[in-house]
């Protein structure tokens, strides 16, 4: 059976290391980390990766007041990806766009903030915001993109821990091949630095990294003095199209997705299973028609 080839025609991102692919890549190659110390509720000063972008570039004051940080990151990344793709977006059928955004977790930030806020009023829930539920539903980051852009095609947020962004890309590829959409926005976002629970959780596991003098040296996984990770926020969204559609409009083709695979370790909550990892990679290479050896 013929399957359409799926290509990437646009990339948009925001990260502690930059707000464009060019800036992000240059900082990576130059060894720039841009980790800083932030003062986090109940935790004190902790190292974190903080994005530096202007959400007002694409959002109104009302959207920012009602929405979430994850939503702002998702909207910024999606809008930048659309611009990068060269699509005539405003004149396209928005019902033929799909939005598939992966996230590790969502809703913790908003719930923590509300509990803290009502603690000032003896935990009187009359002071609990009516925006809480729409902010914390799992599909929020993808949903905020559709509200901002006017996209009326399918959208949902995919939870797959640290692989959620990849899962979003795979879902987009499958929907394009099924003909459910003509263009897909897919990727991943995280607002984790806004949640003290994330930091406290990693600290309780002995996995929250520190460095005695330089926060930029905190993340050092291949160093014998390594002692944990750095929690960061950020997002990246790709524009995906069928190859024939991209070629027909003369699009700049950045890359092609030639293979993928998802599996499960089925062994532990956090410890990776090397056998399952190797199995997944070999299966992806097989789908791509590539020799693992």
Where in the sequence are the language-model features?
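Conserved active-site and cofactor/substrate-binding residues in soluble primary-metabolism enzymes
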Residues: 19, 23, 65, 69-76, ...
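Short glycine-aspartate micro-motif
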Residues: 6-8, 96-100, 182-186, 219, ...
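Glycine-/small-residue-rich "gating" segment that lines the acyl/pantetheine channel
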Residues: 120-129, 170, 174, 178, ...
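Active-site-proximal alpha-helical scaffold in enzymes
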Residues: 74-87, 138-149, 155-189, 229-251
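Conserved beta-ketoacyl condensing-enzyme motif
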Residues: 7-8, 25, 29-157, 189-199, ...
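Acidic, glycine-rich active-site loops and adjacent beta-strand->loop/helix elements
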Residues: 13-14, 103-106, 160-164, 188-193, ...
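Condensing-enzyme catalytic core mediating Claisen C-C bond formation in acyl metabolism
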Residues: 5-9, 29-37, 213-292
